[in-house]
Amino acid sequence: FGENKGYYDGAKFSLLTFMNWVLNEDPVEIVILTENPDEFESYPVTVFPISAQQRNEWSLDGKYHFRIKNRGMAYIMDQLELTEQDKILFLDTDTYFHKSPLPLFDLIQPNQALFYLNEGLIYNRKRFQVYIDHLEGKTIQIDNDVYELSKESSMWGSLMVGIMPNMRPSLDWADKLMQVFIDTVPAHTIEPFSLAESLLRKYKMTEGKKYVSLYSTSRKKEHAIPIIAEFLNKCQALPIDKQISLAQKVIIKRSAFKVIKQRILHLLR
């Protein structure tokens, strides 16, 4: 959503690199949730549009725009005609695939959810101290349950989330917890933290980091977005099969020289 073309280009590149590994007989459907459906009209995907009203409601009138991810996931699951055996893999737009992502679906089980990465225990990482400062020793009532921060609470990166239909209620529970956190914990990571804490009440969690590549940091984005834009400008008119093939040849990873150059330029600013 939004006006940043880099997000739309990233979604296109992500789906093209994903499709390289999907055979015609694989029961995989790619779904895009977007404010601008026209951006994806030439791609073999199912598109669900987001209205301005939905965006405002989901972001609490702009108060916390990361809430859109939770509400968007819930919305897609409600719109799709899912069976109890279906597996849903949500991906951010700054992901791409140079190895098969299909093993990720094997990691998603009725008793196990998938996240991108376990970033560590809240009590073991200094950068998560804000959660201890504002939640330690407190109880939060959500429906008929009580939430408390524990020594086992961890931060999980939600660049990728894999769940099954039986886990759908956990999205709503996480959303209620998140709305409490919005007013009590001054951290932008409350969206993934609330979802992980919600899911871990009933399910195991595993990470899928080794199956996906990404460019989520600011300097990686600075390097990757122009490369992806150039690729799409050159190839977007080609048949989809050709785009899929050529996308695998695009090099996003920065060279050591590029990393050093960016660091020097950053220091000089």
Describe the predicted segments one by one.
Residues Q85-D92, M155-M160:
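Extracellular structured ligand-interaction cores
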Residues D9-K12, L16, R67-R71, T189-F193, ...:
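A structural signal for well-ordered alpha-helical segments within the folded catalytic domains
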Residues I142-K234:
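Catalytic core and acceptor-binding pocket of nucleotide-sugar-dependent glycosyltransferases
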Residues F1, I32-E35, L91-T93, Y116-N118, ...:
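Short His-Asn-centered micro-motif
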Residues Y96-L135:
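Conserved donor-nucleotide/metal-binding helix-loop-beta segment in metal-dependent transferases, i.e.
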Residues E222-R269:
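Long, low-complexity C-terminal extensions of enzymes
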Residues F1-Y64, Q79-E84, R168, V259-R269:
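N-terminal anchoring/stem segment of glycosyltransferases
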Residues N56-L89, K99, P103, F115-Y116:
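A conserved donor-nucleotide-binding helix/loop in the catalytic core
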